[in-house]
């Protein structure tokens, strides 16, 4: 390789750099590491040097081999991987031989030829830059405006003025079917609001994760339908063309409709790029010559039709080759075609799994929609009048379900459109209802305003075709329709054009032969209407040609039988809309506005379906109770809902969102026959007669939450507002059958508790068991709870665990517990921030209240002194306490004499829970004195994690042979050792030992000890031994 030849090649590489990259190259040239043995070039000489001058300077100062190495290093540093690879691939074989005079002459001629080529390329480069500017201008013009879905001819909206920022997160989320579940977006958003999830910055979308990583070449935007994927892709195009985004990274951005490409004619990638460019004969060859400077925006991967399981041989590698659209895009995605090009792909979650099979490394970004602040911003941007915007936003804020749904930009637009049309017509916003069905009905009727009798008939006939088309698409899981599909359902091209104008359909401007509903939920809405529209006198669908293929079965039983079976959950919203549409008031409204007849015949079938699901033995089947409630809520017809709810003897649902609370409140307040009501978030309700549940309850295993669950619970603060509480609690005073209420884990708070207390004192309230664990209660509500205990003789079980009641709250509570009319039998006060100061009040209750038999005080700092005070009253033979829980109460052996005294005098006490207290061997020795007394009737003793060793096993051995009442002994998580356990085994073999259950969890045994336990179990099958070697 001759020197001049190296100079020409370096100059050509430098010529490929854009102005900004060329400046970066010069900057890095100054910072080139001196340890690499290169001479730095003075800045004065490089500052004004062009490509040839700079190449010459590099070689003159450092020689051709070092100059080549410098260029490679800097290409990598400025992220020009293409030039780095090219320079690496074309690197000469360096020789030290002297160059002859003849060679120098040949080199001089070659240099002149190279310079002439350089001047020619400079001219071409200028033309290229001129075309780049022309293309950017074209993109700005094309993407600066958008058309609202109901825009009239010539109407458009400035994208920059309307666009509202969406929340993007980088973390990869679960692949649940949520494309058509608008409300599920609200749930997802609510769950992560308090979680430390960082938002994604669009400017850094293609940047490497860290300084040691490669740049990102493929980004996937995922989000449900209507969440804003397309509008975000268009905004990226506009910002790039306006020189606000990716200026240093991409020379060209091309926006590709996946739907259009997959359904269009065969073409090459060059043809596809040309279709995105202005004017004839764009420089395709020059554009694709630098694929690393190209970004393809593929919008709507989920709408891409075609197979994606081709072998790699079937893929396209030549940008000039004509192929099917799906082959072209698959080749780009799989990096067989222009592998150095970058991709930004938008898709719905349901297609993500298919996409992942095609991708290599990719950055996944999820679009979560609008935050609360952004929703307000959207309203302000949509309404030109700020006062109108604030009035509309206040209305939706008060309306929780719609406010939640407005996380989704499309729904936000629908709501704003409907409200603005009402405002413009002078109608009251109070008429706007609160369900999805009501919003869609109003939107539909606004678009189908009659224009004379003939227009009414025309709309009515077209409605038939729309509904049958929608239902056919639902059953066949089809969202794209060709003109032949429209004709098969009696829809003419003129009808479709009219509906496009009125925004019931969306027709792609560049792909006129294919149609789709503007949103999947609209298709589901029309599919639901298909089951309600009356047929004509001949029993046939109006306006449907005889050549039409077989229409979907209109039997609603078939629809309900298939509920939940579709992979994409298509039928969930169809059934919800079905319930919403049979509301008699809405039916009359629709019949008047749409000039059609809607049948009410299916009401009985829907009622039977609800009854069958309500009486199902398992709650795990589809649909869940909550989903049934959503259906009834959508209907908003109290008589029907009350009949349906009469089939729910037991309600047990988990609430996750505000919307869940609203829906459950509506249904529960219309329920008259429920016997047990559990609105739970994180806990399971305790069982009346199940020993293990009570033990678990006393141990507070249920209080162990993961960090996420805690954050999630905190994110639900104020969900149970006073108005919601009154709605839910109204059923308590009107339903004599309702005896159990579990609200554990809900943020009830003192205001909600006060509302509940009012209800509990109503004569018609028959609640016997009430669980209020972790409900954000404080001492301020204890006076009202005390009043309930004094006046409600029916309440026998109360759980107030995990509420910061404090000593003062317990003092107030004890006033009611001491009352003559208090019949409470079981009381949980676990983890209520109590100290020994509360024990005086509790002791006074034990000496006067003869109904209380179970008291759980675990997870409170009672200490030895506090327990000593309690024991003075418990040891009274007239105290009826049977079960006492003192788990993790800060006890030592100091309290054991008092406990031993209780055991030797009170024959009513049968269960004592002392886990997590440092009693030690001495404590057990003192306890055994009471346990060996003839008056002791204790059946269950739990001493897990009590700092015991093998020394206590002698005392326990004596206990096991002498005490005839003890049936269960728990010694887990103690250091008893093999010797201690073997001693117990010898005693347990004796016939005089009546123990039925021994728990030795979280303890290590050697082989001999383990074998001894197994042998004992075999020889004495009536004895259950539970042991798990520690790991």
Curated annotation (Swiss-Prot):
Keyword check for Nucleus: yes
Quote the Pfam families the UniProt record gives.
Answer: FISNA, LRR_6, NACHT, NLRC4_HD2, NOD2_WH, PYRIN
Q: Where are the LRR repeats?
A: 737-757, 766-787, 794-814, 823-844, 851-871, 880-901, 908-929, 937-958, 965-986
Enzyme superclass (EC): hydrolase
Q: Where is the Pyrin domain?
A: 1-93
Q: What is its main location?
A: cytoplasm
Give the residues carrying a lipid (S-palmitoyl cysteine). 125, 832-833, 839, 953
Short motif KFERQ-like motif 3, span: 793-797
Report the residue ranges where the short sequence motif KFERQ-like motif 1 is annotated in this entry.
352-356
Residues annotated to bind ATP: 164, 223-230, 519
Q: Which GO terms describe its biological process?
A: detection of biotic stimulus; inflammatory response; innate immune response; negative regulation of non-canonical NF-kappaB signal transduction; NLRP3 inflammasome complex assembly; positive regulation of inflammatory response; positive regulation of interleukin-1 beta production; positive regulation of interleukin-4 production
Q: Where is the motif (KFERQ-like motif 4)? A: 986-990
Q: Which InterPro entries match?
A: DAPIN, DEATH-like_dom_sf, Leu-rich_rpt, LRR_dom_sf, NACHT-assoc, NACHT_NTPase, NLRP_HD2, NLRP_innate_immun_reg
Motif range for KFERQ-like motif 2? 601-605
Which stretches make up the FISNA domain? 135-207
Activity regulation: Under resting conditions, NLRP3 binds ADP and is autoinhibited. Inactive NLRP3 forms homodecameric double-ring cages that hide pyrin domains within NACHT-LRR rings to avoid premature activation. NLRP3 activation stimuli include extracellular ATP, nigericin, reactive oxygen species, crystals of monosodium urate or cholesterol, amyloid-beta fibers, environmental or industrial particles and nanoparticles, such as asbestos, silica, aluminum salts, cytosolic dsRNA, etc. Almost all stimuli trigger intracellular K(+) efflux.
All residue ranges annotated as the NACHT domain in the record:
217-533
Its UniProt entry gives the catalysed reaction(s) as: ATP + H2O = ADP + phosphate + H(+)
Transmembrane portions of the chain: none
Q: What PTMs does it carry? A: Phosphorylation at Ser-198 by MAPK8/JNK1 increases inflammasome activation by promoting deubiquitination by BRCC3 and NLRP3 homooligomerization. Phosphorylation at Ser-801 by CSNK1A1 prevents inflammasome activation by preventing NEK7 recruitment. Phosphorylation at Ser-5 in the pyrin domain inhibits homomultimerization of NLRP3 and activation of the NLRP3 inflammasome: dephosphorylation by protein phosphatase 2A (PP2A) promotes assembly of the NLRP3 inflammasome. Phosphorylation at Ser-292 by PKD/PRKD1 promotes NLRP3 inflammasome assembly. Ubiquitinated; undergoes both 'Lys-48'- and 'Lys-63'-linked polyubiquitination. Ubiquitination does not lead to degradation, but inhibits inflammasome activation. Deubiquitination is catalyzed by BRCC3 and associated with NLRP3 activation and inflammasome assembly. This process can be induced by the activation of Toll-like receptors (by LPS), through a non-transcriptional pathway dependent on the mitochondrial production of reactive oxygen species, and by ATP. Ubiquitinated by TRIM31 via 'Lys-48'-linked ubiquitination, leading to its degradation by the proteasome.
Domain characteristics, as noted in the entry: The pyrin domain (also called DAPIN domain or PYD) is involved in PYCARD/ASC-binding.
What PANTHER family does the annotation carry?
A: NACHT, LRR AND PYD DOMAINS-CONTAINING PROTEIN 12, NACHT, LRR AND PYD DOMAINS-CONTAINING PROTEIN 3
- Subunit relationships: Sensor component of NLRP3 inflammasomes; inflammasomes are supramolecular complexes that assemble in the cytosol in response to pathogens and other damage-associated signals and play critical roles in innate immunity and inflammation. The core of NLRP3 inflammasomes consists of a signal sensor component (NLRP3), an adapter (PYCARD/ASC), which recruits an effector pro-inflammatory caspase (CASP1 and, possibly, CASP4 and CASP5). Homodecamer; inactive NLRP3 forms homodecameric double-ring cages that hide pyrin domains within NACHT-LRR rings to avoid premature activation.
- Say what the protein does: Sensor component of the NLRP3 inflammasome, which mediates inflammasome activation in response to defects in membrane integrity, leading to secretion of inflammatory cytokines IL1B and IL18 and pyroptosis. In response to pathogens and other damage-associated signals that affect the integrity of membranes, initiates the formation of the inflammasome polymeric complex composed of NLRP3, CASP1 and PYCARD/ASC. Independently of inflammasome activation, regulates the differentiation of T helper 2 (Th2) cells and has a role in Th2 cell-dependent asthma and tumor growth. During Th2 differentiation, required for optimal IRF4 binding to IL4 promoter and for IRF4-dependent IL4 transcription. Binds to the consensus DNA sequence 5'-GRRGGNRGAG-3'. May also participate in the transcription of IL5, IL13, GATA3, CCR3, CCR4 and MAF.
State the name under which the record lists this protein.
NACHT, LRR and PYD domains-containing protein 3
Q: Supply the source organism for this entry.
A: Bos taurus (Bovine)
Lineage in the entry?
Eukaryota, Metazoa, Chordata, Craniata, Vertebrata
Recorded name of the encoding gene:
NLRP3
């Amino acid at each position: 390789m001759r020197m001049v030849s190296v100079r020409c090649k370096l100059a050509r590489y430098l010529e490929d750099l854009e102005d900004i990259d060329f400046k970066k190259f010069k900057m890095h040239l100054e910072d080139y590491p001196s340890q690499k043995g290169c001479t730095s070039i003075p800045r004065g000489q490089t500052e004004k040097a062009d490509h040839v001058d700079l190449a010459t300077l590099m070689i003159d100062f450092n020689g051709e081999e070092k100059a080549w190495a410098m260029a490679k290093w800097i290409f990598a540093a400025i992220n020009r991987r293409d030039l780095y690879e090219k320079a690496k691939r074309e690197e000469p074989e360096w020789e030290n031989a002297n160059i002859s005079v003849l060679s120098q002459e040949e080199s001089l001629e070659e240099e002149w030829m190279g310079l002439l080529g350089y001047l020619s390329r400079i001219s071409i480069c200028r033309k290229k830059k001129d075309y780049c500017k022309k293309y950017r201008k074209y993109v700005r013009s094309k993407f600066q405006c958008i058309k609202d879905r109901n825009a009239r001819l010539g109407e458009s909206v400035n994208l920059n003025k309307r666009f509202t920022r969406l929340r993007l997160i980088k973390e990869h989320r679960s692949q649940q079917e949520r494309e058509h579940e608008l409300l599920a977006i609200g749930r997802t958003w609510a769950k992560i609001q308090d979680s430390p999830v960082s938002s994604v910055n669009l400017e850094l979308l293609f940047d490497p994760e860290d300084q040691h990583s490669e740049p990102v070449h493929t980004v996937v935007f995922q989000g449900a339908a209507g969440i804003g994927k397309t509008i975000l892709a268009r905004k990226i195009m506009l910002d790039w063309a306006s020189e606000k985004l990716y200026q240093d990274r991409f020379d060209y951005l091309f926006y590709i409709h996946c739907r259009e490409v997959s359904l269009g004619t065969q073409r090459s990638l060059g043809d596809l790029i040309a279709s995105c460019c202005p004017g004839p004969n764009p420089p395709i060859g020059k554009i694709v010559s630098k694929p690393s400077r190209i970004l393809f925006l593929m919008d709507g991967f989920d709408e891409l039709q075609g197979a994606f399981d081709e072998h790699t041989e079937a893929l396209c590698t030549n940008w000039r080759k004509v192929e099917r659209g799906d082959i072209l895009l698959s080749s780009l995605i799989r990096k067989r075609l222009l592998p150095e090009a970058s991709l930004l792909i938008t898709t719905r979650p349901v297609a993500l799994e298919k996409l992942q099979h095609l991708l290599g490394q990719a950055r996944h970004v999820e679009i979560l929609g609008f935050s609360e602040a952004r929703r307000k911003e959207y309203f302000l941007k949509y309404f030109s009048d700020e006062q109108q915007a604030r009035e509309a936003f206040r209305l939706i804020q008060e309306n929780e379900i719609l406010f939640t749904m407005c996380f989704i930009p499309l729904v936000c637009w629908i709501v704003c459109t409907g409200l603005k049309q009402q405002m413009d017509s002078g109608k009251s916003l109070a008429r706007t209802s609160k369900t999805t069905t009501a919003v869609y009905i109003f939107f539909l009727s606004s678009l189908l305003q009659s224009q004379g009798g003939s227009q009414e008939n025309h709309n009515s006939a077209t409605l038939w075709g729309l509904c049958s088309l929608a239902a056919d698409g639902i059953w066949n899981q089809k969202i794209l329709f060709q003109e032949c599909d429209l004709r098969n359902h009696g829809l003419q091209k003129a009808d479709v054009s009219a509906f496009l104008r009125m925004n019931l359909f969306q027709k792609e401007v560049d792909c006129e032969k294919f149609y789709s509903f503007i949103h999947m939920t609209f298709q589901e809405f029309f599919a639901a209407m298909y089951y309600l529209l009356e047929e004509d006198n001949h029993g046939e669908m109006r306006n449907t040609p005889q050549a039409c293929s077989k229409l979907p079965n209109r039997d609603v039983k078939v629809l309900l039988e298939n509920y939940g079976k579709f992979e994409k959950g298509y039928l969930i919203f169809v059934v919800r809309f079905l319930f919403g549409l049979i509301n008699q008031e809405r039916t009359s409204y629709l019949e008047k506005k749409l000039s059609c007849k809607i049948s009410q015949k299916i009401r009985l079938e829907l009622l039977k379906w609800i009854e069958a699901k309500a009486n199902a033995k398992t709650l795990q089947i589809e649909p869940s109770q909550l989903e049934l409630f959503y259906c009834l809520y959508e209907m908003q017809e109290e008589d029907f809902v009350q009949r349906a709810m009469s089939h729910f003897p037991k309600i047990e649902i988990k609430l996750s969102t505000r919307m869940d609370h609203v829906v459950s409140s509506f249904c529960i307040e219309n329920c008259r026959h429920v016997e047990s009501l559990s609105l739970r978030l994180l806990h399971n309700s305790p069982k009346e007669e199940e020993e293990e549940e009570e033990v678990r309850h006393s141990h507070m295993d249920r209080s162990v939450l993961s960090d996420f669950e805690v954050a999630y619970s905190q994110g639900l603060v104020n969900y149970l507002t006073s108005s919601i509480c009154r709605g839910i609690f109204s059923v308590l005073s009107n339903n004599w059958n309702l005896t159990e209420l579990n609200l554990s884990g809900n943020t009830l708070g003192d205001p909600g508790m006060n509302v509940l207390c009012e209800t509990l004192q109503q004569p018609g309230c028959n609640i016997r068991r009430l669980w209020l664990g972790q409900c954000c209660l404080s001492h301020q509500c204890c006076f009202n709870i005390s009043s309930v205990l004094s006046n409600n003789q029916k309440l026998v079980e109360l759980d107030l665990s995990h509420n910061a009641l404090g000593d003062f709250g317990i003092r107030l509570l004890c006033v009611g517990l001491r009352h003559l009319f208090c019949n409470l039998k079981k009381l949980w006060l676990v983890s209520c921030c109590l100290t020994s100061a509360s024990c005086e009040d509790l002791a006074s209750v034990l000496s006067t209240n003869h109904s209380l038999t179970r008291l759980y005080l675990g997870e409170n700092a009672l200490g030895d002194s506090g327990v000593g005070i309690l024991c003075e009253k418990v040891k009274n033979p007239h105290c009826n306490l049977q079960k006492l829980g003192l788990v993790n109460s800060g006890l030592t052996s100091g309290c054991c004499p008092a406990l031993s005294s209780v055991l030797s005098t009170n024959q009513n006490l049968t269960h004592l829970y002392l886990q997590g207290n440092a009693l030690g061997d001495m404590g057990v020795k003192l306890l055994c004195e009471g346990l060996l007394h003839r008056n002791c009737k204790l059946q269950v003793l739990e001493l897990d994690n009590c700092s015991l060793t093998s020394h206590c096993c002698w005392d326990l051995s004596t206990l096991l042979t002498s005490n005839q009442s003890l049936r269960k002994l728990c010694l887990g998580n103690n250091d008893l050792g093999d010797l201690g356990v073997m001693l117990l085994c010898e005693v347990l073999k004796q016939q005089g030992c009546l123990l039925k259950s021994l728990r030795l969890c979280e303890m290590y045994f050697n082989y001999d000890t383990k074998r001894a336990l197994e042998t004992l179990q075999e020889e004495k099958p009536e004895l259950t031994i539970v042991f798990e070697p520690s790991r």
